[in-house]
């Protein structure tokens, strides 16, 4: 049996990062700063690393060296857990800032949304250049839509329109709303509308055209680009299965002291309960998979909504359980180190740029349809294959980190050129959803 090099290194690195610089509360006491700006920055860094590990765990299994990345299987089904952390921290930070900063909503969208929009278009330039270099075949209308963001050239960039929608909903909800209950309800409904649209539309516009057009052999791939799977906004469960964490974050910030007092009583019992809830919700998802209940049933001719709604309900339970687990755990221990700090300060850019190195190095290594096919018969877990996969992993991480620094630098420079963009808060926000 071949020694699992990838597993040892990846999971060992995670363990080291979680332990190095960890802030541990003394016996009988609790961390008071586990949801401070510094702490949540490091939490975002952890989430950014989790997302790229999720994407690294998803290569096609074609009998080549990339199969060794299957040792990261643990991350394959939980990518949205890490994205949920981004939404949770964003919702938490907004409510905290609203409560502590005078006139926080003044120029809110300009301060919070504009840097994200600039970052999106800076990112898009890199992907445009990459696809031009590859000679990607797209119609003029598809190019125009993807250049301007009406459709996405980078599938991972779905986070940008969703977080902008959430920020806009937050601004509308709290701008003139004297009742916080109604404001919270408005934000919840904004999330529900996004969920509702996905449950109706699913992964492509099945309703656009003659009834059942998509069931004909090859029809999906012969259709105009905008009718093909995951071509437009909200065509995919990843658009909606973690956004509820934004609302959870708002609730946590609004009830911060009550939650702290509640969880400090019988902390161990509640922590164990959160662990069991995470395990049970994950097991329930696996059970649904076993019963052929999942998001992609339309590709086998079943367009009913109920199976997706069931799976989304379980995903929502998973997000709640995961956030609860993280929240309770961090009351006792949270991690602070240079890696998480760097990733936390570049979380949006790191998230947006990772798809480019993932694809580019798979081509350079000959593991993609755009490069040489892997030779048949290569050992799936041989040492040579594992070392090749490990080199790929390191190069992807390094290139993504470098690109994130470049994109953040360019974003800040462009924002600085905009009229009246000299406030310190605006400069802090220029890297994404970092500043409170």
Could you say what each language-model-derived stretch is?
Residues 43, 72-82, 233, 237-240, ...:
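Physicochemical signature of membrane-embedded alpha-helices that form the seven-helix bundle of GPCRs
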Residues 90, 248, 343:
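Short glycine-rich loop/turn motifs that provide flexible caps or phosphate-binding loops at active sites
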């Amino acid at each position: 049996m071949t020694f699992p090099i990838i597993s040892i290194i990846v999971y060992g690195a995670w363990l080291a990062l979680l332990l190095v610089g960890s802030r541990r509360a003394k016996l009988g006491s609790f961390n008071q700063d586990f949801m401070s700006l510094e702490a949540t920055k490091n939490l975002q860094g952890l989430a950014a690393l989790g997302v790229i590990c999720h994407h690294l765990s998803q290569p096609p299994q074609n009998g080549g060296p990339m199969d060794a990345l299957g040792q990261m299987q643990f991350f394959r089904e939980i990518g949205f857990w890490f994205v949920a952390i981004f939404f949770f921290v964003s919702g938490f930070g907004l409510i905290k800032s609203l409560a502590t900063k005078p006139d926080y909503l003044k120029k809110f969208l300009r301060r919070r949304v504009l840097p994200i929009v600039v970052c999106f278009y800076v990112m898009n330039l890199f992907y445009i250049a990459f696809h031009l270099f590859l000679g990607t075949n797209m119609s003029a209308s598809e190019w125009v839509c993807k250049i301007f963001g009406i459709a996405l050239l980078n599938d991972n960039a779905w986070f940008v329109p969703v977080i902008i929608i959430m920020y806009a909903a937050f601004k509308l909800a709290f701008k003139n709303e004297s009742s916080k209950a109604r404001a919270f309800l408005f934000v919840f409904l904004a999330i529900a509308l996004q969920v509702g649209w996905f449950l109706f539309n699913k992964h492509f516009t099945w309703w656009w055209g003659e009834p059942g057009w998509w069931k004909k052999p090859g029809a999906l791939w012969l259709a105009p680009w905008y009718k093909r799977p995951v071509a437009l906004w909200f065509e995919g469960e990843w658009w909606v299965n973690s956004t509820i964490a934004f609302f959870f974050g708002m609730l946590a910030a609004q009830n911060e002291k009550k939650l702290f007092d509640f969880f400090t009583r019988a902390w161990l019992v509640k922590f164990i309960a959160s662990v069991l809830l995470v395990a049970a919700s994950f097991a329930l998802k696996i059970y649904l998979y076993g019963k052929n209940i999942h998001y992609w049933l339309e590709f086998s001719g079943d367009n009913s909504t109920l199976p997706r709604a069931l799976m989304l309900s379980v995903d929502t339970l998973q997000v709640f359980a995961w956030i609860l687990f993280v929240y309770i755990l961090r009351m006792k221990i949270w991690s602070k180190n240079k890696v998480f700090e760097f990733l936390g300060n570049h979380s949006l850019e790191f998230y947006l740029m990772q798809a480019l190195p993932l694809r580019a190095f798979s081509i350079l290594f000959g593991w993609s349809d755009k490069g040489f096919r892997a030779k048949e018969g290569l050992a799936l877990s041989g040492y040579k294959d594992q070392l090749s996969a490990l080199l790929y992993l390191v190069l992807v991480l390094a290139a993504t980190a470098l690109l994130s620094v470049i994109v953040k630098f360019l974003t800040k420079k462009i924002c600085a050129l905009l009229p009246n963009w000299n406030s310190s808060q605006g400069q802090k926000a220029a890297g994404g959803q970092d500043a409170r």
